[in-house]
Amino acid sequence: MDFLKEMINASGNKYASKVDDGLDGADVSGYIDTGSYVFNALLSGSLFDGLPNNKITCLAGESATGKTYFSIGIVAQFLAANPEGVVLYFDTEQAVTSDMFTERGVDPKRIAVFPVETVEEFRHQCLTIVDKVLATDESERKPMMIVLDSLGMLSTAKEMNDVAEGKNTRDMTRAQVIKGTFRVLTLKLGKAKIPMLMTNHTYDVVGAYVPTKELGGGSGLKYAASTIVTLSKKKDKQDDEVVGNLITCKLYKSRLTKENKIVQVQLNFDSGLNRYYGLVDLALDCGIFKKNSTKIELPDGTKVFEKHINEEPQKYFTDEILKQIDEKVQEEFKYG
């Protein structure tokens, strides 16, 4: 037995390991397809990956930017990819309904909604569940995903007590409670290989030299989440009818891909995320497609209008084209 192995055994830490054996709970062993190629690229540096399967990912934005619909779309993708999988959805806003899930193709028998009011409630229930998973033999565990929608609406036990007593004082402990919660959760979720997706609100920083958005909840989430994406939207119209939103996604923080990268996705009110939206721009940026006057020139020299590509994306984004784009995406989005 080599020296490092002896030190690991002496520590009594069953999760410790040599780097060349893989880091249990830290290394990303898989990804969850988000339903959008360009959003996958933003999160993971590949069109074909997406949300890390053992990390905390946060979608942050102002009210009505589509954070809940975005989350439900990702939940649907997770359940579709994992026929035995389940989702635990912590709802702090009473924002979701049964219809919202079923309309997005989510199997209602495989998702449970947990209404919670305070950070302490969420922490206790979530940690109890994760500890139960960790106590279960790995061969008997089912794929699981946890969603918190949203962190920004969680109160604290102190704030609830102050309101009940008629006190009008600001809760100065909230940021610390949140920080402590995710300090514990982050490591346990990694060990249990459970991905967490959460939403949060942003607000304008008063007095900033340039317009600046800040995340709600203090600094705790910034350190806990592996990935934070800020969302902003504009209406998507067809024939003067609003059919959805065009959402600009900026990488606020990431441990896997380059920060401050930006992509735009299309969120349709009826069909959810458009898998192919944004690929034309990505292909142009990568040099796979070329702009030729009013048309797009494909690698084989064919020239077509962008409108036709968007109408039949599967015809033009063949497996070979997607592979070429993905190679460029990995160079552009990943570190090193």
Where are these regions (language model features)?
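Peripheral, non-AAA+ core regions of ATP-driven protein-machinery
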Residues: 21-27, 38, 242-245, 252, ...
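Long, well-ordered amphipathic alpha-helical subdomains in the mid-to-C-terminal portions
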Residues: 275-304
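Phosphate-binding/switch region of NTP-binding enzymes
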Residues: 171-286
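Phosphate-binding/switch loop-helix module in NTP-utilizing enzymes
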Residues: 117-193
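The Walker A/P-loop phosphate-binding site
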Residues: 2-110, 122-131
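Catalytic P-loop NTPase motifs of RecA-like helicase/translocase cores
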Residues: 96, 154-155, 205-206
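A short alpha->loop->secondary-structure connector
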Residues: 79-80, 104-111, 162-171, 213-218
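Terminal-proximal interaction/regulatory segments of ATP-powered molecular machines
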Residues: 294-336
